[in-house]
């Protein structure tokens, strides 16, 4: 939702239906009108978009601790996203996924560590990737 004021349209795709309901409620409560959410597999959603010739300028991805899937990352590359914002809670899977995305034509432009859980060992890392295609 934070990107909605910078975009013509924002689409959120999430497997967890309760999270989708919460996101819809939050968008309504905050008066965000150029956003829609759907429950489903984000990789399949991106594949369908690419098959229809649609593209996204920016893809935000926040995979589980196990990291992303090659299917999802292939879909990101296929649809021609110019930038990817990758949020990760696991530095090991982040490194693995960045290596894969590099093979798909993305380069890391910057990375930021966010201490969302003070006094714990947990961190979030946000990486900005740019397509070199």
What are these regions (language model features)?
Residues 1-133:
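Rossmann-like S-adenosyl-L-methionine
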């Amino acid at each position: 939702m934070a990107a909605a004021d910078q975009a013509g349209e924002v689409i959120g795709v999430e497997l967890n239906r309760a999270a989708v309901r919460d996101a819809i409620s939050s968008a309504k409560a905050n008066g965000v009108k150029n956003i829609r959410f759907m429950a489903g597999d984000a990789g399949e959603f991106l594949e369908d978009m690419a098959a229809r010739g649609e593209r996204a300028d920016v893809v935000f991805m926040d995979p589980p601790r196990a990291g992303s899937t090659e299917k999802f990352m292939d879909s990101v590359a296929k649809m021609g996203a110019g930038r990817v914002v990758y949020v990760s809670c696991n530095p090991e899977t982040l490194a693995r996924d960045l290596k894969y995305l590099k093979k798909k034509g993305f380069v890391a432009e910057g990375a930021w560590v966010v201490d969302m859980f003070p006094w714990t060992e947990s961190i979030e890392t946000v990486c900005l990737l740019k397509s070199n295609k």
